[in-house]
């Protein structure tokens, strides 16, 4: 039985009715049933479905059913994503707008609730409950109110954003809407400070981007190769980066930067300068928050280069400010470690290098930058010349000048300038880094000037550093920069470079330097000595080097002339080898590319097939699950309706109260109905027992009560009668008094009104006199109008009646014509029916006549068949006795150890010695001929009837062409006398063999033996086929040759049979039989398999049959029954050899 489904507009009306009566859940269920129905998906337009969808989402928002809203949105997307994208966009935006409005309302309600709570009691602000709650949970009233009122709506809004993003992530038509919703979700996280949701949102968007980058064959799939898609994704990631920076989620900001760089690298179009500037600015901010001053400065330098090159309207102040920012960030980079920790302790670990390389890729640099390379690039870009005088001096003091005694004082002046200048607010974060770099420069320059220095003196030189910070920097310089520093706390002194056995690395440190350290001098002593000795030798022997060079040049020239031809050939041969190698490699590459292309094409084809198979399986699985879900939903709905129906009754509520929710889910509708019936029966039994006990109790109680109340009733009635009588008397007295008073008042009023009669009569007379003339005039006008209207209506009625009579006359005339036509048509139809009935009766009479003739013919044929069968049985018995007698004498005449002898050459036909041949042969021959004729009549009934007079054709083959005779081989035939006129026995004819036997089996059998249905073949006239059978056809009739008749001892077959054969068929019989054969086919059934006795009869039929020769009667009907009987099973019994 199909489920009842409502039309969408009817469902919307019903939902509105449920909402009006305060049942939003029922309204939502009604709309959800419509959305779950698959029949309406493509049957209605968006004008019908869109209002229903808005109502559906409104109910979902009101009830906070985000999962139900998701189901409806997915259904709506599948329906209209290719038809009307604007409708889908309006629905989704409306849904999110409703969710945001409810969330804002909840926030306002939460704040109002806290305000009311705070203003509740001004005298007792801190209640005991608030104190305990703050001590237990550490939250104030606003947090508790938000968690109770606001948090559910915030969660619902977050789920709505996630559902919409999941809904639109692969739809290219809704791509802009997808990115708008992503920005709305970022704003939501900022507004409500949802950091965990922001992280999940970033992961979700990153997963969506990975899915987009994968190849997709969907019709509505988003392609990352499109420029619009790349730009939208880039804008969304930039918004994500801004939101992450505002929420101080630096890890998410760094991941967003990686995504932005990947999108820019993927895009074939160069990003706009504004985007790149924003990218470098955010990247510098992230590096600054991460404490990576090196890459922060590199990002600012890239931003400066981009702005300087592409921004045409850049003012001098802006350029100066940006240059100062870049210069100060570069100078604030800590001095590089000469021996980093990962080189010293974990030299095999490449992760820091890989991380630096990865960060360099984000900046578009080929290799990680260094402090020296950045300062060199700053100088190349002429940045120190673009900044103000103070910052230019800062660069010179730190990187060019060597003045350790005044270094910190000079830097302090720059620091004061930065702190006091309001326009230098962006430079304030670099002050501490600048101080650390200054202290490190100071220590390095002091180490080149002094071997030792007092701690207090160094503190005076490092004015903006305390003793603890200074000692820490000294230790770090020893640890990271390989400086030789020793602190003597006892003497409160510091010693530099006193150990001559240790030195720095081979490269010199960057920055200004006065001289090398003593340890550096000891390390480079041999190098210096070699340099000085080389210079001395060149001074002592000034021409030696020139002579050596000339000698070496001469040797080189001679060597060249010796090897130039060989080298030339070698180069040519090498070039040829290179070309051959290139050709070989090209061929290999082409073959490899072709093979790879074929492999990829095969893999692609397999992948497509696998994907198609997977999609089909998923479709089948979805259909199966959907079917299961529908069945489950039907069951649940039926169970729910049954439970609701039962819960409306008292016994149902009682029965359901005994079951928990899990128990109800385990039951189906039948089990619940069964339990309900059991509960009803039990309650009925309890009620019957209670009623019986109650009946007995009430009976006793009522009887006792009535006995006791009888005297009380009598007393009460007597008192009541007295009271009623007194009440009636008092009431009647009051009524009489009131009636008398009313009559007196009425009489007085009548007397007063009688005095007004004369005045009334005078006023009426005067009024009638005044209005009499006006009345007469109006009456005349009215009568004139009445007369005119009467005449007009009479004229109209005459015209109308005349027209009605004319129309009635025309209508009657038309009806008369139609009636006559109908009568003519009915008469013609009756004549046709009578003619058809007469033809039908004629046909039935003819059919009945044919059936009677057919039945008569059938009875005659059955009688003939019965007689033939009896003759066959009699002859079979005679032949069986003859064979038994012959078998007894056979062994006497058979040669020893041999088989039957062949026919003697004399042609006498006697192959048994001493046996009476003539009589036996003649008797057997007669019996065989009778069998032959009887069987052949049945076998070839149709053929003999068809041939009729054609049997009198020429037959010159004599007895040798009989269809029973098997010819002897050529050798035996040659030895036999040709003119032996003695009659041969039938057994001898049968046993003559030779090549004719093979002809009979191979050729004759194929041509003439009827092994099955063959009359449907077109073999030409019957006469031609009979002529082809001359090799073994029956030839028992009179011959047309002049050969004398054999003496057969008065055989009855010697009589002429022409008349008999001529009378068997009429002139029309042959035509009718031919028609019968053409219509039904003269198919013969399979021959019965009967064993042929090997006795001396020589006949190949085992079932003899005798017949009476009498002329065939002429029949109007074809002999279908006779032919059918002959064909059905008695046409032959030949045992095939």
UniProtKB/Swiss-Prot annotation:
Transmembrane segments: none annotated. The modification Phosphoserine is found at residue 908. It holds the Pfam family eIF3a_PCI_TPR-like. One of its GO terms (biological process) is translation reinitiation. GO terms for cellular component: eukaryotic 43S preinitiation complex; eukaryotic 48S preinitiation complex; eukaryotic translation initiation factor 3 complex; eukaryotic translation initiation factor 3 complex, eIF3e; eukaryotic translation initiation factor 3 complex, eIF3m; multi-eIF complex. It is found in: Cytoplasm. Residues 588-631, 829-1137 are annotated as: Disordered. PROSITE patterns: PCI (PS50250). GO terms for molecular function: mRNA binding; translation initiation factor activity. Residues 588-623, 829-899, 922-971, 985-1046, 1054-1083, 1106-1127 have a biased composition (Basic and acidic residues). Its main location: cytoplasm. Keywords: Cytoplasm, Initiation factor, Phosphoprotein, Protein biosynthesis, RNA-binding. InterPro entries: EIF3A (IPR027512), eIF3a_PCI_TPR-like (IPR054711), PCI_dom (IPR000717). Residues 319-501 form the PCI domain. Component of the eukaryotic translation initiation factor 3 (eIF-3) complex. The eIF-3 complex interacts with pix. RNA-binding component of the eukaryotic translation initiation factor 3 (eIF-3) complex, which is involved in protein synthesis of a specialized repertoire of mRNAs and, together with other initiation factors, stimulates binding of mRNA and methionyl-tRNAi to the 40S ribosome. The eIF-3 complex specifically targets and initiates translation of a subset of mRNAs involved in cell proliferation. Belongs to the eIF-3 subunit A family. This is Eukaryotic translation initiation factor 3 subunit A. It comes from Drosophila yakuba (Fruit fly). The gene is eIF3a.
């Amino acid at each position: 039985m199909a489920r009842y489904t409502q039309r969408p507009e009817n469902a919307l009306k019903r939902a509105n009715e449920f909402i009006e009566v305060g049942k939003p859940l029922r309204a939502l269920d009604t709309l959800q049933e419509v959305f779950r129905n698959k029949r309406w998906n493509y049957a209605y337009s968006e004008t019908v479905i869109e209002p229903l969808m808005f109502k559906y989402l409104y109910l979902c928002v009101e009830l906070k059913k985000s999962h139900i809203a998701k189901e409806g949105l997915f259904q709506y997307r599948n329906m209209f994503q290719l038809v009307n994208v604007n409708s889908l966009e309006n629905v989704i935006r409306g849904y999110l707008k409703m969710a945001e409005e409810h969330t804002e309302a909840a926030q306002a309600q939460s704040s109002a609730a806290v305000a009311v709570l705070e203003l509740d009691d001004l005298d007792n602000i801190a209640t005991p409950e608030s104190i305990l709650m703050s001590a237990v949970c550490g939250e104030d009233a606003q947090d508790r109110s938000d968690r109770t009122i606001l948090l559910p709506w915030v969660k619902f809004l977050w789920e709505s954003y996630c559902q919409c993003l999941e809904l639109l992530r692969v739809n290219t038509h809704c791509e802009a809407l997808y990115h708008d919703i992503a920005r709305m979700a970022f704003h939501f996280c900022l507004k409500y400070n949802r950091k965990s949701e922001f992280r999940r949102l970033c992961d979700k968007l990153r997963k969506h981007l990975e899915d987009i980058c994968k190849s997709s064959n969907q019709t509505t799939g988003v392609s990352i190769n499109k420029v619009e898609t790349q730009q939208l994704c880039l804008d969304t990631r930039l918004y994500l980066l801004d939101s992450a920076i505002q929420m101080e989620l630096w890890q998410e900001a760094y991941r967003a930067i990686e995504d932005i760089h990947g999108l820019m690298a993927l895009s074939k179009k160069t990003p706009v300068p504004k985007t790149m500037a924003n990218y470098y600015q955010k990247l510098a901010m992230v590096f600054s928050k991460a404490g990576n001053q090196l890459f922060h400065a590199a990002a600012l330098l890239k931003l400066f280069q981009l702005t300087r090159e592409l921004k045409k309207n850049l003012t001098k102040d802006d350029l100066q400010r940006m240059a100062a920012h870049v210069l100060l960030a570069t100078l604030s980079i800590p001095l590089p470690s000469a021996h980093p920790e990962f080189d010293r302790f974990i030299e095999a670990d490449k992760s820091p290098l890989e991380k630096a390389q990865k960060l360099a890729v984000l900046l578009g640099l080929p290799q990680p930058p260094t402090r020296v390379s950045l300062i060199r690039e700053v100088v190349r870009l002429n940045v120190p010349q673009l900044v103000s005088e103070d910052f230019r001096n800062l660069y010179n003091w730190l990187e060019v000048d060597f003045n350790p005694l005044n270094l910190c004082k000079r830097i302090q002046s720059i620091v004061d300038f930065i702190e006091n200048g309001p326009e230098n607010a962006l430079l304030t974060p670099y002050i501490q880094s600048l101080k650390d770099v200054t202290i490190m420069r100071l220590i390095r320059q002091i180490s080149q000037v002094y071997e030792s220095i007092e701690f207090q003196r160094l503190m005076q030189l490092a004015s903006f550093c305390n003793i603890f910070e200074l000692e820490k920097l000294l230790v770090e310089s020893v640890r990271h920069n390989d400086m030789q520093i020793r602190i003597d706390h006892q003497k409160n002194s510091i010693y530099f470079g006193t150990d001559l056995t240790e030195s720095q690395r081979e490269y010199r440190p960057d920055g200004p330097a006065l001289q090398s350290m003593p340890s550096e001098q000891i390390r480079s002593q041999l190098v210096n000595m070699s340099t000085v000795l080389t210079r001395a030798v060149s001074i002592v022997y000034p021409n030696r080097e020139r002579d050596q060079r000339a000698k070496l040049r001469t040797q080189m020239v001679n060597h060249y002339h010796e090897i130039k031809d060989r080298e030339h050939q070698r180069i040519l041969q090498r070039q040829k080898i290179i070309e051959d190698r290139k050709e070989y490699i090209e061929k290999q590459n082409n073959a490899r590319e072709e093979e790879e292309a074929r492999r990829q094409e095969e893999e692609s084809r397999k992948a497509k097939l696998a994907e198609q198979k997977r999609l089909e399986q998923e479709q089948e699985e979805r259909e199966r699950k959907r079917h299961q879900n529908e069945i489950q939903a039907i069951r649940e709905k039926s169970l729910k309706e049954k439970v609701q129906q039962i819960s409306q009754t008292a016994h149902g509520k009682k029965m359901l109260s005994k079951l928990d929710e899990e128990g109800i889910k385990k039951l189906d509708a039948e089990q619940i109905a069964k339990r309900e019936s059991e509960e009803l029966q039990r309650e009925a039994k309890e009620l019957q027992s209670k009623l019986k006990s109650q009946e007995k109790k009430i009976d006793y109680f009522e009887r006792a009560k009535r006995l006791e109340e009888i005297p009380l009733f009598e007393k009460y009635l007597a008192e009541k009668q007295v009271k009623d009588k007194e009440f009636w008397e008092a009431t009647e007295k009051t009524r009489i008094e009131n009636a008398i008073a009313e009559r007196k008042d009425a009489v007085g009023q009548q007397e007063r009104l009688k005095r007004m009669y004369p005045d009334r009569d005078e006023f009426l007379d005067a009024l009638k006199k005044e209005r009499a003339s006006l009345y007469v005039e109006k009456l005349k006008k009215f009568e004139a109008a009445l007369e005119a209207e009467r005449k007009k209506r009479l004229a109209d009625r005459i015209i109308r009646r005349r027209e009605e009579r004319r129309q009635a006359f025309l209508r009657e005339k038309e009806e008369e014509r139609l009636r006559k036509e109908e009568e003519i048509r009915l008469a013609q139809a009756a004549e046709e029916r009578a003619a058809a009935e007469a033809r039908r009766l004629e046909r039935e009479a003819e059919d009945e006549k044919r059936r009677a003739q057919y039945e008569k013919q059938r009875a005659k044929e059955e009688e003939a068949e019965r007689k033939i069968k009896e003759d066959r049985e009699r002859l079979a018995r005679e032949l069986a006795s003859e064979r038994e007698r012959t078998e007894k004498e056979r062994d006497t005449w058979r040669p020893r150890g041999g088989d039957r002898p062949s026919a003697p050459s004399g042609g006498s036909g006697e192959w048994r010695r001493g046996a009476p041949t003539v009589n036996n042969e003649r008797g057997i021959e007669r019996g065989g001929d009778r069998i032959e004729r009887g069987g052949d009549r049945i076998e070839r009934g149709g053929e003999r009837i068809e041939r009729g007079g054609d049997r009198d054709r020429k037959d010159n083959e004599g007895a040798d062409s009989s269809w029973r005779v098997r010819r002897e081989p050529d050798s035996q035939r040659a030895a036999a006398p040709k003119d032996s006129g003695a009659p041969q026995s039938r057994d001898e004819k049968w046993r003559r063999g030779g090549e004719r036997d093979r002809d009979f089996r191979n050729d004759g059998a194929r041509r003439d033996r009827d092994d099955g249905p063959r009359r449907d073949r077109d073999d030409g006239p019957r006469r031609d086929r009979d002529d082809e059978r001359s090799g073994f056809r029956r030839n028992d009739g009179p011959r047309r040759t002049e050969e004398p008749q054999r003496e057969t001892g008065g055989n009855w077959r010697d009589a002429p049979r022409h008349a008999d054969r001529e009378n068997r068929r009429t002139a029309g019989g042959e035509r009718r039989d031919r028609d019968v054969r053409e219509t039904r086919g003269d198919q013969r059934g399979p021959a019965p398999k009967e064993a042929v006795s090997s006795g001396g009869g020589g006949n190949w039929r085992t079932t003899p049959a005798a017949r009476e020769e009498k002329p065939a009667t002429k029949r109007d009907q074809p002999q279908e029954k006779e032919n059918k009987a002959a064909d059905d099973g008695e046409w032959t019994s030949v045992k095939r050899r």
